[in-house]
């Protein structure tokens, strides 16, 4: 009973924080609101450790039925909390990163008048993510799924007076609604064919669903898994549905850290892992997931190379790392995917919040306009360096263990996406060093007064990052130990399912495969330092007056026109033209169609329908009003005229007949 109450508290404390700060927004004291938000989230994080020790390490499963929700005939759905090893590790990632972001926000948003509203939205965001990962059925999961989508809209567009923030929020909302349409179709299909939305009932029907062929060689399970994965692609920003993610940087930096590290974007990876029982019986969709993940990790990393906005580089890095996670799930290494999800939560939050400290100090996001900040902000420099090395996968940091686990699984599965993963690892190291060299080394490009006043942020912003540094160091070692348990899937043995135990295949990979990820990371580091150590390194602008004294002049236009390297750089700089393609193929046709409907609705239907009728009535009433002159002789004329017309009518009638 005690553990059940703790589970309820973990989820309800963020909700209570959001409700209290949201309802009493205008009357509550600012300091009290901050204490409530950070205190409640910190308690939730501490409670999650207790549940991790009980459920995760001891192998217990907690299932709490809170109250009935839907009951139609034999179809029943309850509000429930389901805690197993997978949920408990997600609780750790979500609550700890969220509580750190809440504390960091006290300093970052200190001068913002809407800080209480901001904390309310952050807490609500956390609640929906916790509800998502603790559900025991697809409908409750969809409730949390849509909840994090709505909260992301509110937080990305938090500065609603800023037009670009509003556009980014709408863009994120619409793209996620498009993918969520596929997701809800998948849930409906599950309910139709299984008669239930509960995980236990649906997952036990996986083999049966795989034998129901609907056309060609596709089973109904293939369709279900495809629809669910399309939903995951939108939420986790995979290639094709990724375009909202960099625009989400318009929100405050703590929002970026929360969205990209522990909530929302990780929901898709969690869903695939939770539904491993379904996906294992759909090998075709698993291959599709592997390809999408592998292509995304290389695709996003290549874009990050060419960006100059510090937050957008890290955003594309998130997109790339999510690709790694999906690639792991695609080769049935769900445990490796979740392992990387958790380690990534710590070092990516560290990177975002360190970037926030830089932005807070110099009020600039273009890395080519910074430089030489390592002496001004040594703690931030150290934090960013640790986060970057963890991202690259350097031993003994967390990324080394989790990324290595994914690439080993990809290699052992025989997937050619292993090559994509290795290539992405090199690019990851290059763009990580690009930020470090241009922001913290070299000659500063900042204005003199800005550079002189640059300093470390307040302790309320710096101190919480110590926990993220600890997580970036030790989460990998702990995770490696948990996965090494003498059971299939290690720590996740009761949560994940493998139709073919891939673990036997990778128990003894070649030594060079184990060392290759870190080796290519080191190559990328050296390359990044070489390319960006010069203060005259180019920023790839659209036009440049001269290429003289520029080390990387090979990328400029040749005397014969555009070189292949310039063409590639333009493609990368313009993000493979996805926005332009969508604008041409989707946005403009929809706008044209909307204009056509507007013409038909406003200019034809309304003009000759309700509006036209009202104009006729108005004209008639005006004419009628003019008859009422108030003069007796006018009324006498009307009477005489009426009598004359009446008599004339009857006389004419008699003459005719």
Curated annotation (Swiss-Prot):
It catalyses: a quinone + NADH + 5 H(+)(in) = a quinol + NAD(+) + 4 H(+)(out). Its EC number is 7.1.1.-. It is an enzyme of class 7 (translocase). Pfam families: Proton_antipo_M (PF00361), Proton_antipo_N (PF00662). GO terms for cellular component: plasma membrane. It is found in: Cell membrane. One of its GO terms (molecular function) is quinone binding. It comes from the Bacteria. The chain crosses the membrane at residues 5-25, 32-52, 89-109, 114-134, 138-158, 172-192, 214-234, 253-273, 285-305, 313-333, 339-359, 381-401, 416-436, 465-485, 511-531, 580-600, 632-652. InterPro entries: NADHpl_OxRdtase_5_subgr (IPR018393), ND/Mrp_TM (IPR001750), NU5C-like (IPR003945), Proton_antipo_N (IPR001516). GO terms for biological process: ATP synthesis coupled electron transport; electron transport coupled proton transport. Gene3D superfamilies: 1.20.5.2700. Keywords: Cell membrane, Membrane, NAD, Quinone, Translocase, Transmembrane, Transmembrane helix. It is a multi-pass membrane protein. NDH-1 shuttles electrons from NADH, via FMN and iron-sulfur (Fe-S) centers, to quinones in the respiratory chain. Couples the redox reaction to proton translocation (for every two electrons transferred, four hydrogen ions are translocated across the cytoplasmic membrane), and thus conserves the redox energy in a proton gradient. PANTHER family: NADH-UBIQUINONE OXIDOREDUCTASE CHAIN 5. Belongs to the complex I subunit 5 family. This is NADH-quinone oxidoreductase subunit L.
